Amino acid sequence: MNHFELFGLPNQFELDGGLLSLQFRELQKRFHPDNFATSSERDRLLSIQKAAQINDAYQTLKNPVSRAEYILSEQGHDIRGEQTTMQDPMFLMQQMELREELESLPSSSDPESALFDFAENVTAMRKSQLVQLQELLKNEAWIEAAQSVRKLKFIEKLNQEVEQLEEKLLG
């Protein structure tokens, strides 16, 4: 049983996050190890394994990047943990320029405002990449979808760096 089937969801990238959370809570209640405290050793172990499977599946599906990686792995294109280098020089150049811009923000005349604008740009890039990824997965363009996930990972990392700088500037 795959992660989508476990939660009774369609096997697709786009999903209802509210329904995922609802199903997660229901499954957690049903298979919580405390419910099997008086059961046989075998049943207790099975409930622990099932609870771990439910938690793992939920963590995978709630995050768009890990969800896309999971879908790709189910289609024979497992890119989780890969060390493949990005093959898109224009995208890499853009990422380098964005990181340079991010590094220069603290010394700008209004760092908070500049960071806010920069963060909005990164958020727009992320949304655009997610839309593209959704379309590629829907069309079963697995190779291109894998490349899109790699780009999304770069954007996610950049977003983390934005959040770190925000904490540094405001905290």
UniProtKB/Swiss-Prot annotation:
Keyword terms of this UniProt record: Chaperone
Stored CDD domains: DnaJ
GO terms of biological process kind: [2Fe-2S] cluster assembly; protein complex oligomerization; protein folding
Keyword Cytoplasm: no
Entry-linked Pfam families: HSCB_C
Any one of the GO CC terms: iron-sulfur cluster transfer complex
Gene3D superfamilies in alphabetical order: DnaJ domain (1.10.287.110), HscB, C-terminal domain (1.20.1280.20)
InterPro entries: DnaJ_domain, HscB, HscB_C_sf, HscB_oligo_C, J_dom_sf
Gene Ontology molecular function: ATPase activator activity; protein-folding chaperone binding
Role: Co-chaperone involved in the maturation of iron-sulfur cluster-containing proteins. Seems to help targeting proteins to be folded toward HscA.
PANTHER family, sorted: IRON-SULFUR CLUSTER CO-CHAPERONE PROTEIN HSCB
HAMAP family xref list: HscB (MF_00682)
Subunit structure: Interacts with HscA and stimulates its ATPase activity.
Matching NCBIfam families: hscB, PRK05014.1
Family: Belongs to the HscB family.
Protein name: Co-chaperone protein HscB homolog
Species of origin: Aliivibrio fischeri (strain ATCC 700601 / ES114) (Vibrio fischeri)
Gene: hscB
